[in-house]
Amino acid sequence: MKTKLTQKQIRFQALLLFFITFFLAELCAVFLYQNQLKEAKLKADYTAQTTIGRVKSQLNHYLAESNLMKHMIEAGYTVDDEEFSVLSSLMQDDQNVIKAHELAKDGIVTLIYPMSGNEAALGLNMLEHPARKQEARLAKESGEYTIAGPFELQQGDIGALLFDPIYTTDANGDQTFWGFSILVLDWESFLNEIELDTLEEAGYTYELWKISPATGEHLSLIHISEPT
């Protein structure tokens, strides 16, 4: 009788030990999974913030190029064709993201560098052009730079336009809209510079989007939902 009772106790203890071990193993697995998930989220957040920072850094770099001409005009300096060409040539970047630099007095493109290959944009009224007017008008009204596109450029290829509004100030301190300093950006080169492909290579899904100034709608520019 004692032997049978001892065997039952052993079986019970073995079964109890099994369930305890199984429970602890499951608990450890859940703990490890949660830690891995937390690390993955932190890594994804860091990667996203790094990418956002890279985009902002690139845009600030391009804006600095545009601001040189902007500040000269705001200071009352009249830029002639030769000076515009010389200064604009210094703005061209090694990565060929900046395809052209334009000045648009009263919103109408009057100066372009380089002119070769960009003749089709000369005389274009940015405040009235169907595909450009929303961002151009927003820049004029807000006093802040806006980016239009990507779309097919007048010159061909796909690009985006950075509108940097220029205002002159009279003796009374009143500001008057002068026009725009415009950078024509090569879209593919811009994407290469901000290295979005690294997100896809790392297995992330992502979307690059903007708010339509005309409708306020969410407009998707790039959407990767199935990374390779």
What function would you assign to each model-found segment?
Residues 41, 45, 75-221, 225:
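Intrinsically disordered, low-complexity polar/acidic regions
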Residues 1-5:
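Short, Lys/Arg-rich, polar N-terminal cytosolic tail immediately upstream
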Residues 10, 14-79:
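Juxtamembrane extracytoplasmic/periplasmic/luminal helical "stalk" adjacent to the first N-terminal
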Residues 7-9, 13, 34-36, 49, ...:
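Residue-identity detector for glutamine
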